[in-house]
Amino acid sequence: MQNTNTLNWINKLIYLSISIPIFFLILVTTYPNSVEAYPVFAQQAYKSPREATGRIVCANCHLAKKTVDIEVPQAVLPNTVFEAVVKIPYDMQLKQVLANGKKGNLNVAAVLILPEGFELAPPDRISPDIKEKIGNLSFQSYSPDQKNILVVGPVPGKKYSEITFPILSPDPSINKQTNFLKYPIYVGGNRGRGQIYLDGSKSNNTIYSSSAEGQVVKIIRKEKGGYEIFIDTIDGRKITDIIPPGPEIIVSEGEFVKVDQPLTNNPNVGGFGQANTEIVLQNPLRMEGLILFFISVILAQVFLVLKKKQFEKVQIAEMNF
């Protein structure tokens, strides 16, 4: 009976020696030290690309909603270079309406909002592997005093539907404004041209609607593209709606239209999306402590196994005796 109890006690020790480090690993990698814890055009009109509501301002001009994804490491050490990969997916076969009304390939652009202290990695710190992924992309800060906000584009979408940002993490021992914490990262990405200009006027990449209720009496296709639609309103006025090159009309002469009724199709095939993720700025001292802890656990397990074998030998000797 005593031998059985001793064996049970040894088995429990071995179980604890395995389960404790696993729990400790989850705790260290999940939580930081403390629980406290568009692009180019947007620069001209907005001090910050992210509104208080969390909405990224690029959505003010790019009205259609699309998806965007971001991939970053779960945790990084201070003063290290890592990749932030922004994915802007779309159908590569699509063609968009260009400013002259003709069809062309889509461009993409992105804005990456990093935590304070994180910034674009200097060229001499970027590895050849990351440089190859970057290609000929040129990144810039949103403003001279906002180095943690990076913008890129517009660039050809067929080549850069995945954009790799080389990021340098801060060192809290040097930058006292940063801490070993879990931080949020925000990203916005668009494909294709916008529907609204900064001054509020429409581009030719959107729907054009009737400005009055009445009858379409005449439609003229202009020599350089676009249309003039003449409408006799119900109150006797005569108005002309101008359609720029690009959208195609969906009304015909003699048709009655209401106010804000679409006169054209929607030529837009692009759109804007935003996403967010988190990253932990990990304290290297914690990692060193974790390694030492694992070494001590492994040694403890070895000693437990040796002790168990020694006990079994004694038990066999007693049985033979």
Curated annotation (Swiss-Prot):
Whether Manganese counts among this entry's keywords is no
Q: Name one GO cellular component term.
A: chloroplast thylakoid membrane
Pfam families per UniProt: Apocytochr_F_C, Apocytochr_F_N
Q: Which Gene3D superfamilies match?
A: 2.40.50.100, Cytochrome f large domain (2.60.40.830), Single helix bin (1.20.5.700)
Top-rank taxon, per record: Eukaryota
- Enumerate the subcellular locations listed in this protein's record, separating them with semicolons: Plastid, Chloroplast thylakoid membrane
Amino acids binding heme:
Y38, C58, C61, H62
Q: Which UniProt keywords apply?
A: Chloroplast, Electron transport, Heme, Iron, Membrane, Metal-binding, Photosynthesis, Plastid, Signal, Thylakoid, Transmembrane, Transmembrane helix, Transport
Give the signal peptide, or none.
Answer: 1-35
Query: What biological process terms from GO does the record include?
Result: photosynthesis
Q: Does the keyword Thylakoid apply?
A: yes
Q: Which residues cross the membrane?
A: 287-307
Please give the cofactor(s) recorded in the UniProt entry for this protein. Answer: heme
Q: Describe how the cofactor binds.
A: Binds 1 heme group covalently.
One annotated GO molecular function is:
electron transfer activity
Membrane topology field:
Single-pass membrane protein
Recorded family membership: Belongs to the cytochrome f family.
Described purpose of this protein according to its UniProt entry: Component of the cytochrome b6-f complex, which mediates electron transfer between photosystem II (PSII) and photosystem I (PSI), cyclic electron flow around PSI, and state transitions.
| Assembly with partners or alone | The 4 large subunits of the cytochrome b6-f complex are cytochrome b6, subunit IV (17 kDa polypeptide, petD), cytochrome f and the Rieske protein, while the 4 small subunits are PetG, PetL, PetM and PetN. The complex functions as a dimer.
Q: What is this protein called?
A: Cytochrome f
- Native organism: Chara vulgaris
Species lineage, top-down? Eukaryota, Viridiplantae, Streptophyta, Charophyceae, Charales
